[in-house]
Swiss-Prot record:
Component of the RNA degradosome, which is a multiprotein complex involved in RNA processing and mRNA degradation. Keywords: Cytoplasm, Magnesium, Metal-binding, Nucleotidyltransferase, RNA-binding, Transferase. This is Polyribonucleotide nucleotidyltransferase. The keyword Nucleotidyltransferase applies. It is found in: Cytoplasm. Residues 553-612 form the KH domain. It comes from Pectobacterium atrosepticum (strain SCRI 1043 / ATCC BAA-672). GO terms for molecular function: 3'-5'-RNA exonuclease activity; magnesium ion binding; polyribonucleotide nucleotidyltransferase activity; RNA binding. Mg(2+) binds at D486, D492. Belongs to the polyribonucleotide nucleotidyltransferase family. It catalyses: RNA(n+1) + phosphate = RNA(n) + a ribonucleoside 5'-diphosphate. GO terms for biological process: mRNA catabolic process; RNA processing. Involved in mRNA degradation. Catalyzes the phosphorolysis of single-stranded polyribonucleotides processively in the 3'- to 5'-direction.
Length: 706
């Protein structure tokens, strides 16, 4: 019999329901989590044993949205969900980051978390619901896991923090921050902000962590009622004798290797040491496992680097804890791009370009709650050559999507509004060298490339990655971390912003016990680093260029009456298509009558504007127009005037004498002058050829002598 176990609790303005025991009973654990009609079904399956020879922890997290959740059909030919969208990939990473550090060291059994959105309320984002579900399912499963975690979204409205704001509230909020953590520690922060101060950001993190305790309490209550027995798992026994032998052979040599400041040379030396140690030990005892020796060597490396930092000695590359690597900033490095920059910080380098386009270049994004368009795109590419390796080149991986989104968050707050700058903007960051903090190099490069392209951003932005080494109460915060310091440290803390405030904050913490004091030190140290980088960037380019590139499309904006929109578009789009072909421009019309004409050639744009003005001009009675015959009928001819408007020339108005047959005087496509006699209430236009012809008028005029 199905026997569901349910917990309900109030979480801010929402009601959260946790339910287990009803579905997917063959999974290790399964939970249905709902928050005001947004429901996510989360399952966890863990392998009872690790695969032979497994050397890493194979955790996979898959977040998937089903269109039926919103009562919609999937797009595409097959009408079925396909590969994960960018949003699904980002949410998968968001779930993965806070849970990964909570599995014990040495646990190598395969674990898969699948979160499926099965119902969606447009006002409640499913990502927070999915994270709560993953925490609950892992806690119920019995798999070794130091959870549960809580999670909260924090907004900032009217100078007040808002817990789990609705979608509408987020549009007005100056902050969108997601914080996850255990009962005693923050583990992950992901946020974008509109130039908030360090204190405001830290306050949001602390607020979110305090508020999410109710989630942890309710998951613990659910586990007490429905949790499965804890697995009998023990960490592999430590081979103390082998550790001592490895240490004796390698510690001093690794210490010398980590004084080599150049990355490739250091890596080469470390690899030689590791190969020598494995060979020496296996020569003594060929039954020894090379993987076990490599793992011990990795721990010795970690201890060497961390010990030096905590002792106040210089870092791997010789810097002090708060020093930034050497900077080289160049703009306008590519001749035909609309904007470009080369940003180099030590051994990390990004070639960044900015491209301007029209509204039709904007990305159409099909989300669960409907379609939206994105006018600012930022893409991050991390090719294998940037770290001196070979590898597959193809579609972006999860990491590239995540880093691109972080860089975009860093720049978004300073981008101009559509009514100020009606262009779609695409920024691409090509990482050409990498030794730590390439996403923050992308923020700096994006700011420079946008200024070089003439995009009127509100201010320059820069990004910096901070690290942490902590043992007991002793801790050191590191500015501008290297790749090794990221790998061997306890925290990766990325901050982007301008001189006025923070635009993005991302934090991943590998240990418990990160206090408010440590976060405060890190934020303040990051501010100093950010201001230093901005100072160097401003020497290269301090304000956006006064004009856009000659190779970029220029957008000219005019306004027409809304009742004239149909005239410019024409039947089935015939008029606007003809205009586009005739003028060689791109023309876009909005519902309020705003017309945007884009062209790299100023004369073509002027021609398009002139033609649109002709089409939308009011027909004046008594005025003579040049028209073209479009249809011939027995009682006269229809003539197109004023860009698509048609009027009738009655047979009696063709000539000053009796006309028996219209085709004796007019042919299809013939251009003739016509005078407007009348526009009736229904908008029908009556025309005359004979009154438009000066000779006819002179002949018909009475003599002045009479």
């Amino acid at each position: 019999m199905l026997n569901p176990i349910v917990r309900k609790f109030q979480y801010g303005q929402h009601t959260v329901t946790l339910e287990t025991g009803m579905m997917a009973r063959q999974a290790t654990a399964a939970v249905m989590v709902s928050m005001d009609d947004t429901a996510v079904f989360v399952t966890v399956v863990g392998a009872k044993n690790a695969k032979p020879g497994q050397s890493f922890f194979p955790l996979t997290v898959n977040y998937q949205e089903r269109t039926y959740a919103a009562g919609r059909f999937p797009g595409g030919f097959f009408r079925r969900e396909g590969r994960p969208s960018e949003g699904e990939t980002l949410t998968s990473r968001l779930i993965d980051r806070p849970i990964r550090p909570l599995f014990p060291e040495g646990f190598l059994n395969e674990v898969q978390v699948i979160a499926t959105v099965v119902s969606v309320n447009p006002q409640v984002s499913p990502d927070i619901v999915a994270m709560i579900g993953a925490s609950a399912a892992l806690s119920l499963s019995g798999i070794p896991f130091s959870g549960p975690i809580g999670v909260a979204r924090v907004g900032y409205l009217n100078d007040q923090y808002v817990l789990n704001p609705t979608t509408d509230e987020l549009k007005e909020s100056r902050l969108d921050l997601v914080v996850a953590g255990t009962q005693g520690a923050v583990l992950m922060v992901e946020s974008e902000a509109e130039l908030l101060s360090e204190d405001q950001m830290l306050g949001a993190v602390v607020f979110g962590h305090e508020q999410q305790q109710i989630v942890i309490e309710n998951i613990n209550s659910l586990v007490a009622e429905a949790g499965k027995p804890k697995w009998e798992w023990h960490a592999p026994a430590v081979n103390v004798s082998l550790e001592q032998r490895v240490q004796a052979l390698s510690e001093a040599r690794l210490g010398d290797a980590y004084r080599i400041t150049e990355k490739q040379e250091r890596y080469a030396q470390v690899n030689v040491i590791k190969t020598d140690v494995v060979a020496a030990l296996q020569a003594e005892d060929e039954t020894l496992n090379a993987g076990e020796i490599q793992e011990i060597l990795g721990n010795i490396e970690k201890n060497v680097v961390r010990g030096r930092v905590l002792a106040g000695e210089p870092r791997i590359d010789g810097r002090e804890k708060d020093m930034i690597r050497g900077l080289d900033v160049r703009t306008g490095v590519l001749p035909r791009t609309h904007g470009s920059a080369l940003f180099t910080r030590g051994e990390t380098q990004a070639l960044v370009t900015a491209t301007l386009g029209t509204e039709r270049d904007a990305q159409n994004i099909d989300e669960l709650t409907g379609e939206r368009t994105d006018r600012f795109l930022l893409h991050y590419n991390f090719p294998p050559y940037c770290v001196g390796e070979t590898g597959m080149v193809g579609s972006p991986k999860r990491r590239e999507i995540g880093h691109g989104r972080l860089a975009k968050r860093g720049v978004l707050a300073v981008m101009p509004k559509a009514n100020e700058f009606p262009y779609t903007v695409r920024v691409v960051s090509e990482i050409t060298e990498s030794n730590g903090s390439s996403s923050m190099a992308s923020v700096c490069g994006a700011s420079l490339a946008l200024m070089d392209a003439g995009v009127p951003i509100k201010s320059a932005v820069a990004g910096i990655a901070m690290g942490l080494v902590k043992e007991g109460d002793n801790f050191v915060v590191l500015s501008d971390i290297l790749g090794d310091e990221d790998h061997l440290g306890d925290m990766d803390f990325k901050v982007a912003g301008s001189r006025e405030g923070i635009t993005a904050l991302q934090m991943d913490i590998k240990i418990e016990g990160i206090t408010r004091e440590i976060m405060q030190v890190a934020l303040n140290q990051a501010k100093g680093a950010r201001l230093h980088i901005l100072g160097v960037m401003e020497q290269a380019i301090s304000t956006p260029r006064g004009d856009i590139s000659e190779f970029a499309p220029r957008i000219h904006t005019i306004k027409i009456s809304t009742d004239k929109i149909k005239d410019v578009i024409g039947k089935g789009g015939s008029v606007i298509r003809a205009l586009t072909e005739e003028t060689g421009t791109t023309i876009e019309i909005e519902d309020d009558g705003t017309v945007r004409i884009a062209s790299t050639d100023g004369e073509k744009a002027k021609h398009a504007i002139r033609r649109i003005e002709e089409i939308t001009a009011e027909i004046e009675v008594g005025r003579v127009y040049q028209g073209k015959v479009t249809r011939i009928v027995d009682f006269g001819a229809f003539v197109a005037i004023g860009g698509g408007k048609e009027g009738l020339v009655h047979i009696s108005q063709i000539a000053d004498k009796r006309v028996e047959k219209v085709t004796d005087y007019l042919q299809m496509g013939q251009e003739v002058p016509v005078k407007v006699l009348e526009v009736d209430r229904q908008g029908r236009v009556r025309l005359s050829i004979k009154e438009a012809n000066p000779q006819t008028q002179e002949a018909a005029a009475p003599s002045s002598e009479e």
